[in-house]
UniProtKB/Swiss-Prot annotation:
This is Undecaprenyl-diphosphatase. It catalyses: di-trans,octa-cis-undecaprenyl diphosphate + H2O = di-trans,octa-cis-undecaprenyl phosphate + phosphate + H(+). It comes from the Archaea. GO terms for molecular function: undecaprenyl-diphosphatase activity. Its EC number is 3.6.1.27. The chain crosses the membrane at residues 1-21, 38-58, 93-113, 118-138, 168-188, 191-211, 222-242, 256-276. It comes from Methanobrevibacter smithii (strain ATCC 35061 / DSM 861 / OCM 144 / PS). The gene is uppP. The keyword Cell membrane applies.
Length: 277
């Protein structure tokens, strides 16, 4: 993989990790179109770039969540967890994120081999699920923005969004798309649904990063320059994608992404079954 290809793949990763169009599908499509196969080291640093992007964008919230978690541990030691939990929205948020991450962790562990086989399969698989992503987005935009935000978020809404994230382990189902849609279905405010979706992505991306990192010692192919440019491209484009989507969801619907998913999904699906791709 040369530097230009690395930058393209990095941009695709950064944009599609956070825009509701499925990073897994687009990485498969992009690598297929460019005729390249990314190395383990490259994948590790792409995930690191995406992780840093979301951590930096929500740094104020992350700092408050870390503080709230430590205070919550103190509450447990002092036998006043319930009192602290209901008095501080960030204490609730950090525990809700932890609990909502459990479904995707279980799916990843229990169905790892089955999911990997889908990623290694024909292009029509991610193309089909990309079309499904478009349908989920379109239907979710027909619902009015709810009133649930940080102040009144409950365990029920958190688990429902966590289940949406678990479904998105399938190639072509957008993680941000399914979680935002799940949030809207269960009554979250549109802007908060997107924000919670992004914060919920942090442990998921971190988990993928750690899983790949454990095999880093087996790497023999290491193109440092390509990895650096891919990492920077994923970081910068990921940050911009988060910023743009949060601005967009305040003013307009996400129908444009639904139409995009339908068009790309149909083109790639037809191209795959007719062996054009």
């Amino acid at each position: 993989m040369d530097i230009i290809q690395a930058i393209i793949i990095g941009i695709v990763q950064g944009l599609t990790e956070f825009l509701p169009v499925s990073s897994s599908a687009h990485l498969i499509f992009a690598q297929n179109a460019l005729g390249v196969e990314s190395s383990l080291a490259f994948d590790v640093f792409l995930h690191l770039g995406s992780l840093i992007a979301v951590l930096w964008f929500f740094r104020a919230d992350i700092i408050r969540m870390i503080q709230a978690f430590l205070l919550s541990i103190g509450d447990i030691i002092q036998h006043r967890f319930k009192e602290g939990f209901y008095s501080d929205p960030y204490k609730r948020l950090v525990w809700y994120v932890i609990i909502a991450t459990i479904p995707v962790g279980l799916v990843g562990v229990l169905f790892e081999s089955q999911v990997e086989s889908l990623f290694a399969g024909a292009l029509y698989v991610p193309a089909f699920f990309l079309f499904v992503t478009g349908t989920i987005l379109y239907l979710s935009q027909r619902m009015n923005s709810g009133e649930v935000d940080l102040s009144n978020l409950s365990l029920k809404e958190s688990i429902f969004m966590g289940l949406g994230q678990a479904c998105a382990i399938l190639p072509g189902l957008s993680r941000s798309g399914t979680t935002i849609a799940a949030g809207l279905v269960i009554g979250l405010d549109k802007e908060f649904a997107a924000k919670f979706s992004f914060i919920l992505s942090i442990p998921a991306i971190l988990g993928a990063f750690v899983v790949q990192l454990k095999d880093i010692g087996t790497i023999t192919d290491f193109n440092a320059l390509a990895i650096l440019f891919g990492f920077l491209a994923a970081l910068i484009s990921g940050y911009l994608a988060i910023k743009w989507l949060l601005e967009l969801i305040q003013k307009r619907s996400l129908d444009i992404f639904a139409y995009y998913c339908w068009i790309v999904g149909i083109i790639v699906f037809m191209g795959s079954i007719t062996h054009l791709f």
